[in-house]
Design a protein with these regions (language model features):
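A short, exposed loop/beta-hairpin motif centered on an aromatic-Gly-Thr core
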Residues: 17-30
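A short beta-strand micro-motif
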Residues: 6-14
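Acidic surface patches and DE-rich sequence motifs
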Residues: 14-15, 54
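Short, mixed-charge low-complexity intrinsically disordered segments
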Residues: 31-63
Length: 63
C-alpha cells in the first residue's frame, strides 16, 4: 500500500461557456495548480491511496 494523498474536486474556466465547469475526476492540489484557470472546490478533500491515481495524477471517485 502506498502513502495516502489528498485529492480535490476542481473546476476549470471554460471561455466558450463563460463559466467555471466542475471536472469529474479529482486531483492533488499540486496538479490542479498547474492547470490554467483551475480552482479547487472547497470542502471536497478526500484522502486516497496514491496507487489509486491514474498515470496523469487523477483520481476517479466513481468505480
Amino acid at each position: 500500500m502506498e502513502e495516502p494523498v489528498t485529492v480535490y474536486s476542481f473546476e476549470v474556466w471554460d471561455q466558450q461557456q463563460g463559466a467555471y465547469i466542475a471536472q469529474r475526476l479529482k486531483s492533488p492540489a499540486a496538479r490542479i495548480e498547474r492547470i490554467a484557470k483551475a480552482r479547487i472546490i472547497v470542502g471536497t478533500a478526500e484522502e486516497v491511496d496514491a496507487a489509486a491515481l491514474d498515470p496523469h495524477g487523477r483520481y476517479n471517485p466513481l468505480p
